Design a protein with these regions (language model features):
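Short beta->alpha linker loops
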Residues: 10, 52-56, 76-77, 102, ...
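A metal-dependent, Asp-based hydrolase signature
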Residues: 9-45, 63
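Asp-based, Mg2+/Mn2+-dependent phosphohydrolase catalytic module
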Residues: 29, 78, 82-167
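A short acidic, helix-capping loop that chelates divalent metal ions and anchors anionic groups
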Residues: 18, 42-46, 80, 151-154
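Short, small-residue-biased leader/transition segments that mark boundaries at the very start
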Residues: 2-4
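Short, acidic loop-to-helix structural element flanking the phosphoryl-transfer center
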Residues: 32, 44-72, 78, 82, ...
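Alpha-helical elements of Rossmann-like donor-binding domains used by nucleotide-donor carbohydrate transfer enzymes
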Residues: 17-21, 37, 59, 63, ...
Length: 167
């Protein structure tokens, strides 16, 4: 049985780390198989059941993308970001993406990879967990805490209470 607190406690973790938490009695191989099935189902489900976006997300991303490059780095599985962007009508606003499911690398390395691949000279990472803050630090870029999200930050360079504060 899983409760809301379990979901919040697992936000930002890789799918395999979530699997270890949810299924501690399974072997690593059994856990991998279960999580692969969950990830496939989740990606398929998301195509026809897009998530609920924060207020004005589409308008804010459209506005920001006219002046700045928008990039997404996540600890999610392969395909999740693409499906999410497509199902929510946001694909046109994002220039590049990377995730743990594609590379098997920690988020900090994936952030660094996106920065290098896109020749970014000035950037910052917006996230809502301490793990996001640590990943931005590992990549050597400033971290802005999205306080409306799931977690806390210790020393962000800035804090936003809503997505609209980025415009």
């Amino acid at each position: 049985q899983m409760c809301i607190r379990d979901r919040y406690d697992n936000m930002g973790k890789t799918m395999m780390d979530i699997g270890k938490t949810l299924f501690p009695g399974l072997s690593q191989e059994e856990c991998r198989k279960v999580m692969e099935e969950c990830m496939t189902y989740e990606n398929h489900y998301l195509l026809s059941h897009p998530g609920v976006l924060y207020p004005e997300t589409r308008e804010i991303m459209a506005c920001l993308s006219r002046q700045y490059g928008l990039y997404i780095v996540s600890n999610c599985q392969s395909g999740y970001i693409e499906v999410l962007l497509e199902s929510c009508g946001l694909r046109e606003y994002v220039r590049d993406i990377e995730c743990y499911g594609n590379t098997g690398l920690p988020k900090g390395d994936n952030i660094r990879m996106v920065v290098q691949r896109n020749h970014l000279e000035r950037c910052f990472y917006v996230g809502d967990t301490h793990m996001d803050e640590e990943a931005a630090g590992a990549a050597g870029i400033p971290f802005v805490h999205a306080a409306y999200g799931f977690g806390r930050a210790e020393r962000p360079v800035g804090t936003i209470e809503s997505l609209s504060q980025l415009t």
